[in-house]
């Protein structure tokens, strides 16, 4: 199972989190986010990481030109779209970045809203399901209603996100079967400042399921 820790702001924490077992790290490229990092900060963090760690830039309603430039300049291996991007935008981004993983985040309010996932699976590599919040795009600490995801089986891999912590991860994974999990606020002391004890506890809990 892939484990993505999102909202990394400190290079030394990124190295420690990767060594604890994370398979992917997320860097927020949304300027008004408290977890925002610059291209040079991302590049510095990526340079220190093992080659097998996926490095994902998180964008919201950015242009294809802007996304492409940041990916090239920073060395990111993936792009996560966390705004209101439509399937056609994902298709165009795929043409611009054919060798980069594209993840589309969907903020789920209801079972009906879950149906929009099928519109994206032709154009992206991976989906990410997050909890809906009217004002924040992610890192809200709100959990999804896992029950509505029990039958979710898209034609591509998917991450479960939304308020996951070491304390609820086992319960979440007893109800749903994602390809990976994504955590941000659930392993933090403050926005962007990861708590390595919480990260370690997360991997202990995940290991206990095996």
Swiss-Prot record:
Q: Name one Pfam family in it.
A: PRAI
- Catalysed conversion reaction: N-(5-phospho-beta-D-ribosyl)anthranilate = 1-(2-carboxyphenylamino)-1-deoxy-D-ribulose 5-phosphate
Q: Which UniProt keywords apply?
A: Amino-acid biosynthesis, Aromatic amino acid biosynthesis, Isomerase, Tryptophan biosynthesis
| Enzyme class (EC, first level) | isomerase
EC code = 5.3.1.24
The parts of the chain that form a coiled coil are none
Family per record: Belongs to the TrpF family.
The record ties this protein, via HAMAP family, to: PRAI
Q: What is the name of the protein in this document?
A: N-(5'-phosphoribosyl)anthranilate isomerase
What gene, per UniProt, encodes this protein? trpF
């Amino acid at each position: 199972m892939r484990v993505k820790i999102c909202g990394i702001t400190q290079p030394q924490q990124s190295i420690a989190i990767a060594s604890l077992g994370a398979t992917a790290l997320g860097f927020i490229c949304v300027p008004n986010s408290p977890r925002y990092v610059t291209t040079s900060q991302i590049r510095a963090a990526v340079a220190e990481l093992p080659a097998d760690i996926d490095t994902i830039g998180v964008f919201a309603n950015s242009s294809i030109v802007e996304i492409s430039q940041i990916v090239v300049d920073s060395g990111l291996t993936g792009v996560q779209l966390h705004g209101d991007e439509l399937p056609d935008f994902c298709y165009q981004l795929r043409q611009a970045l054919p060798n980069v993983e594209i993840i589309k985040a969907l903020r789920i309010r209801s079972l009906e809203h879950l149906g929009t996932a099928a519109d994206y699976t032709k154009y992206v590599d991976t989906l990410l399901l997050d909890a809906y919040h009217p004002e924040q795009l992610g890192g809200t600490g709100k959990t999804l209603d896992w029950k509505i995801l029990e039958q979710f089986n898209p034609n591509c891999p998917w991450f479960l996100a939304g308020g996951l912590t070491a304390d609820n991860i086992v319960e979440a994974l007893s109800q749903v079967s994602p390809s990976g999990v994504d955590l941000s606020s659930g392993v933090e002391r403050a926005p962007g400042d990861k708590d390595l004890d919480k990260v370690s506890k997360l991997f202990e809990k995940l290991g206990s399921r095996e």
